[in-house]
Amino acid sequence: MLFAGDRKVWKSFSSYTQNINILSAELSKIVINGYVFPEDCGSIDTNKKILFKKLFSEYYERRIIGFNSFKSGKTWMLLGNEADKIERKYIGYGFSNEYGLFDTTGTAAGLCTDNLKIKAMCELIEKNESMLFWYTTCSKKIIIDEYIRNILKKMNMDKMEIYIYYNNELGNLHTIIILCFENGVFLSSGSCCSLSYNHAIEQAILEAKLIKTVYYDRGGIPYRTFKRHFFFVENI
């Protein structure tokens, strides 16, 4: 069974956060050419059945990307509806002298192809918008209004120092990035790209909550003692 044996699975629950369940796991490890591919996966939801589906979906996405170590291979082009041949560097993690280490992937796993197209596209745009956030000055800081404040309260995050940013450079989709601090210590971040602005806000906050619980609250975050980096907070 997927969740049996020596695989590590953690579940968190708190009645103070609107019955939100958080699940994380380390189900396998893939090492190719000395590189360890992302091995952990996590999910957050009020419905336990959906919680496990989300977790397995992320696990499956990362596992398939890790196994696709070929130099080139056959694929099915959804836009052209035809078979094609594609080089490895276009569908995964890689290295080039021009860009260094890079990630070209927007991935999705599920049963509905139409939904998967949108999800994968949003993830790819989210990654590129995140690059613009970190390395340019095109992001806009969002004022935390009552709508956002209520979501933070539901997640028990309203006492934290929260910064939220908006990117919309690569199309009509909305990308939200959230940074979370407490007493000057960086705790967590979350991001989401969506056709809906409100959905992007909600999912970015949920991701930040998930990451904080999985890494910081369990004492596993490696940079928990780093003080706040004022450059990317004060100058965007």
Language-model regions, residue ranges each:
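Helix-biased "structured C-terminal domain" signature
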Residues: 1-236
